[in-house]
Curated annotation (Swiss-Prot):
InterPro entries: F-box-like_dom_sf, F-box_AtFBL13-like, F-box_dom, FBD, FBL13/AtMIF1-like, LRR_dom_sf, LRR_FXL15/At3g58940/PEG3-like. SUPFAM superfamilies: F-box domain, L domain-like. Residues 342-392 form the FBD domain. This is Probable FBD-associated F-box protein At1g32375. The lineage of its organism: Eukaryota, Viridiplantae, Streptophyta, Embryophyta, Tracheophyta.
């Protein structure tokens, strides 16, 4: 302990910032030097699974320790709640106290697995009292109507996971008052009281929108997106609602499109500038506008769980002249009981197979006739192929050996192409 105490104060404070608030406060008994050192820690994590008996209830522990905290700037204030009955009033007091410390990051996580079913309602003061806030992450709580305007002039990162809202309008008000927002994560939950989740943010660079099959019983629910500066898009919707793109996202370089939308033309057509694309959609017909070309696409991943994956693959290969890396993977169980489509070799070899495709990775390869025909077509057409990696779904050693043997015997147009079987 003597050696530890001899370390520079800045280093000790940094070490303490890695601990929970309960453990940080406990260090005050180590020596006179440590008695006040904990008050300077710029990161406080309050986890109510740590019951501080010496301070009574969890709420009282937070009140007393937080009031004594003396750091000029509080980088992070993180609450992990759910095992005790902290209410709106408690959170209101803590947020008000944090305002005095120029709080930069606020995280509030509610764990409902160990508490009753009552929801934690966040106070309205959250909307206006933390003007220096750069990051706000909220999980499993309730936002209420705003009686006054929002004020997040410095907010760059916002995460809303399993949150409930008073309605569509609050979302619009919240996002319209985040003038420098760059990263937005939205993971919707069942009965969140939102029909159309509208994202109109001109400064946004990264957008994650996830909605599970259970997120809503209303088939009319969906998203409206207007983000002209967007660079990364991750949208997953297994419910099959809608997604309206108000303006093309010409700066998107990375996209993950995994949804059950019947119509994807507008969404896919708006990201034609993408360089890295993952796609899992139910239909290849009109998947994107006729004439669209993915001129910048160099890495493509297609999920093979959908019935139409094979036809979709051929379409995207045809319209991606600079593609270098192709990955095929089945990330989900088959989503349709319809017959699998038959393989129809295209009348013309896609340009990327002749001039640019260098690697093929196939994960959970099953060795069906259609899969073997696709593999054979790519191998005999890929002039620039360097490596083909196959990962089998089967655990049968003999079956794996037969697959490897079949693939190894296929004609390879590229003399330098190597086949690896994982």
């Amino acid at each position: 302990m003597d050696k530890l105490s001899q370390l520079p104060e800045a280093l000790l404070v940094r070490i303490l910032s890695l601990l929970s608030a309960k453990d940080v406060v406990s260090t005050m008994v180590l020596s006179k030097r440590w008695q006040f050192l904990w008050m300077l820690v710029p990161k406080l994590i309050y986890d109510d699974s740590y019951q501080a008996i010496e301070y009574g209830s969890f709420s009282r522990f937070v009140d007393r320790s937080f009031t004594l905290h003396d750091a000029q700037v509080l980088d992070t204030l993180h609450f992990k709640l759910g095992k005790t009955s902290c209410g709106t009033g408690d959170i209101r007091v803590w947020i008000k106290t944090a305002e005095k410390s120029c709080l930069r990051e606020l995280i509030i996580e509610i764990d409902k697995s160990n508490s009753d079913n009552s929801s934690v309602v966040l106070p309205r003061s959250l909307y206006t009292c933390c003007r220096m806030l750069v990051t706000l992450k909220l999980n499993n709580a309730v936002l209420v109507d705003a009686t006054s305007s929002f004020s997040f002039p410095s907010l760059k990162t916002l995460s809303l996971v399993s949150m409930k809202f008073p309605g569509d309008e609050l979302i619009k008000m919240l996002l319209s008052n985040c003038p420098v927002l760059e990263d937005l994560v939205v993971k919707r939950c069942p009965y969140d009281n939102v029909t159309t989740f509208t994202v109109r943010v001109s400064s946004l660079k990264c957008l994650v929108l996830h909605e599970t099959e259970l997120a809503s019983i209303n088939a009319d629910c969906g998203f409206v997106i207007d983000t002209p500066s967007l660079e990364c898009l991750d949208i997953e919707d297994g419910r099959g609602g809608f997604c309206v793109i108000e303006n093309n996202m010409t700066k998107v370089v990375k996209a993950n499109v995994c949804n059950s939308y019947v119509h994807t033309q507008q969404l896919m057509g708006s990201i034609s500038s993408v360089k890295r694309l993952y796609v899992c959609i139910p239909s290849s017909k009109d998947a994107y506008p006729v004439g669209s070309v993915f001129h910048c696409l160099v890495r493509l991943t297609i999920c093979t769980c959908e019935t139409e994956w094979l036809n979709l693959l051929m379409c995207v290969l045809r319209d991606s002249p600079k593609l270098r890396e192709l990955k095929l993977v089945k990330n989900h169980v088959y989503r349709s009981h319809q017959p699998r489509p038959c393989w129809n070799e295209p009348s013309a070899v896609p340009e990327c197979l002749l001039t640019s495709l260098e690697t093929l990775e196939w994960v959970k390869y099953e060795g069906t006739e259609e899969e073997k025909e696709v593999a054979a077509f790519i191998l005999r057409s890929g002039s620039c192929l360097k490596k083909v990696t196959i990962s089998s779904k089967s655990t049968d050693i003999n079956k794996k050996f037969e697959m490897l043997k079949e693939l190894s015997l296929l004609f390879r147009r590229s003399p330098t192409c190597q086949i690896a079987f994982d």
